[in-house]
Every structure is written in structure tokens, then in C-alpha cells.
Amino acid sequence: MTEHKSGFVSIIGRPNVGKSTFVNRVIGHKIAIMSDKAQTTRNKIQGVMTRDDAQIIFIDTPGIHKPKHKLGDYMMRVAKNTLSEIDAIMFMVNVNEDIGRGDEYIMEMLKNVKTPIFLVLNKIDLVHPDTLMPKIEQYQSYMDFTDIIPISALEGLNVDHFIDVLKSFLPEGPKYYPDNQISDHPEQFVVSEIIREKILHLTSEEIPHAIGVNVDRMIKEDEDRVRIEATIYVERDSQKGIVIGKGGKKLKEVGKRARRDIEMLLGSKVYLELWVKVQRDWRNKVNFIRQIGYVEDQD
């Protein structure tokens, strides 16, 4: 009988290297928020990948960055604490970029970790194959890795091969989650992240990190329709105007795009109602940060 492998794998890396894209690719559903703006992942997103011979729980940690407020401090603590809880570490980098200070900081942090560490060179679809070996050698000069795998999370290139390699290093174990469970977050959290993603896509650089989303109400009205009421929080009146847009046009577009993804997630029709409220300096208010879902694990 074939042994069953299971384990927890942390994905760590600088902002925008493709961690969320990878999680969504291997899970087959949108669990982690994707955007071209930095620091879009705020919580540990546990995506559960179940195969006949293995179950891997991927923890998509916030991108490593220098904190600028209490929410940033929280994001960094989540990233570092995750390393002590897992069976393997994926250190993901953008192969199309030079090694930066953030990469060096992460490698310094990983040097004393005993867990298997895989260097995953993402975005190989953007570079010539001849550039891969020099980049690999650069990273190897900093530290030893359990294995080094080039992939494209967006295109799916070499992702299955990486999963096979990863499985070989995981311990034998049971299924921690049912076959049909793809995340340990409640549906409301995933819904709020989908709404936040659409705002990130549609607003300018000043807005994204001032955005918080809370699902106030989510009820099944009948067999094939779910009613969702959510509040979008910003820090300034000017930001509220940007999110709403002229004549409410931008907010309507946010709702339209979010509704489409939420209906795919829930498998039913969705009535989505959105409000925008100003909560001044909310990223420095610990109680409010907890209130809208960014809560550290309790021991």
C-alpha cells in the first residue's frame, strides 16, 4: 500500500514574488489575494492541497518588509512565527529581479532553521533559460538549500514537479482536513479578501494599504442565493471618495468583479451590498485591527 504523506509548508519571500499566485494554482481555487501592489497578504492563508497520496497545507505568509505601523508589525510577526510550526519552507524569489536586501534578510533569518528549505525561482516565463544557472549560483553563495526548483506559478510550469519533490521530504501522516476543504479560513474571510483584491486592482497607489474590509452579514436567503453585506474601511475622506468614484461608478465595478468571484467560490448567486466608511488611522488601532479579522493565533 502506498504511504500517505502530509505536512505543513510555509511560503516565505519578499512582497510580489508570486506566493499567492502559487497557492491559488496548486489549490485550484482563489484563496489568497493577488495584486501587483506590495503587502497584499495580511494573514496566514492556509490552502489545503489534497491528492490521493498526500495532503499539503500551504501557509502563505505576509511578504517580508520593514513595518511602518501596528498592522505592519502584526504582518511581520505572522511571517516569522510561521517558521516554527512547519515541516518545510519554500523561499520564493522573483528570478527576473536581482537579489535584494529583503532576500538577504530572509536568507540570514533562515540560516539557523533546521527545517528543509526549498529555493523556488518563480516567474521563469519572463526570463531566458540561460540566465537561470547564474542566478542559482548567486543564491547558493549565500546558503545551502535542500533543493532548488525553477517554476512559473502563473503559467503552471514545473509546478507539478516541485510538488513531487516536496512530497518526498514530508513525513508520513494522516489527512488533517476533509477532501473538499481548501482553506482553514471561514468563507467570510475569503469573501472579504476577494473584495479587497478588487479594490487593489481598481485604485491608485495611495489607497491599497489604507483599505480594510469586514463582512458584516452573510446569510443564505434561499436555496440558490446568498446575501452579503460588507463594509470597506479607509483612513481619510479623500480615500472614501476615490473608492466610491464619480457617481458611485468605481464602487459598482468593485461589487461587480467581486460578485463574480464570490459566486464561483460559493457555487450560488450572490447579492452583494457594499458600504465605505472612514476609520481614521485604523492601521494603528490594535482593537480595530482585531475587529476586522487580523487576529494573532492564541496559544
UniProtKB/Swiss-Prot annotation:
Residues 13-20 are annotated as: G1. Residues 122-125 are annotated as: G4. GTP binds at residues 13-20, 60-64, 122-125. The lineage of its organism: Bacteria, Bacillati, Bacillota, Bacilli, Bacillales. This is GTPase Era. One of its GO terms (molecular function) is GTPase activity. It comes from the Bacteria. It is found in: Cytoplasm; Cell membrane. An essential GTPase that binds both GDP and GTP, with rapid nucleotide exchange. Plays a role in 16S rRNA processing and 30S ribosomal subunit biogenesis and possibly also in cell cycle regulation and energy metabolism. Gene3D superfamilies: 3.30.300.20, P-loop containing nucleotide triphosphate hydrolases.
